[in-house]
């Protein structure tokens, strides 16, 4: 008996449900003959504690492997892997991060980022930029 060919999977990694809502339908239309699966990371892996340029590729790979294993897929079933991230100001110079003690949260303005903890944002941005730079050269 002839087996029907399975559709190839376009595995799209996003940070949260709002990203899936915003992009899922559009991506499904773009890859109309392919199965699009939008994987929600529930957070930003590029700033997750313990994630660095040396291990970020394997951390993302583990997410993909877990999905493949749970659905009995092999690497040949995947057509493409797309990781969509927002930069969150990762490449903004320190000079454009402003200490604002009255700010409850990060406030992105035309002149830069306003925060009540400049040092924390500078460190976060450095970690994120380093991880994003590593991911740029994958696949």
Where are the predicted features?
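Acidic, divalent-metal-binding catalytic cores of TOPRIM
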Residues: 1-139
